[in-house]
Amino acid sequence: MLPYAEVILFLIKKHCIDCGEAFFGIVVLNALCLAGVGYSLLWHQGPGRSVLFVLVLATLYACLCAFCVVRGERGCDTLADTNLRVFTHALREVWLQSLWCALLQCVLFRTGKYVCTYYFARTHSVFTACGILSAWTYALACGALLWFVPVRARYRTHFRQCVYLSARVFFEHPCITFLMVLYSMGVLALSVPMAFLFPGPCGIVLLWQDVLRTLCFRRAWLAAHEGRKAACAPPIPWEQLMCQMRAQSRAHTVGELFSPWKS
């Protein structure tokens, strides 16, 4: 059995390879998303700014979900060959759930901002405690929604079920979610020299998708051997999952990482 440290290193290595193989798709999608977000935040100051931001956020979710759906169906090594028709079909499949997720995110932001501002503006300790509780509630809700994109791409179910599964993954694996947030912040910091075009958000979501796949594999294995004692239960066959993931990637050298079309 592979130790957990080796599994983590394998996922990080595979993430780097996947980003290299999907370089052009990642750059194009990040450019479109960043242009929309930048316009809604910096240049558009009209009365419809909130509506525009919801639409831009929904577009971001839709692009990320469609990107993951195409990757799950075709494999990361074929993303460079994916035509516009395939991606458009995936967008039509996920746009409604993405819009609901964007609306939910904005409602949470507005509500959390108003409630926290109201409570922290009071000096009484009871209001301060309520403000801290509200801030933690908002943070937990946002943390649960971090899994929405990989959950939607994997299970392809309706919105409420996706939110429920996202919250379930978050509360069952809070430490993993925290580590993923730290890793994502590090990747975003590395994206600064590339103006967040690479790896950026679309590059980060690839690892979230693989981590969710790993967690589901572990959960299914433990559920299949739930009745056995810990001493008698066979170890989790991580090698089997790693072999399946290796088959999804074809570039394994540094040269192929930045020129996958030559592999």
Curated annotation (Swiss-Prot):
The chain crosses the membrane at residues 21-43, 48-70, 127-149, 186-208. Coiled coil: none annotated. One of its GO terms (cellular component) is plasma membrane. It is a multi-pass membrane protein. It is found in: Cell membrane. Keywords: Cell membrane, Membrane, Transmembrane, Transmembrane helix. The keyword Cell membrane applies. The keyword Zinc does not apply. This is Uncharacterized protein TP_0273. It comes from Treponema pallidum (strain Nichols).
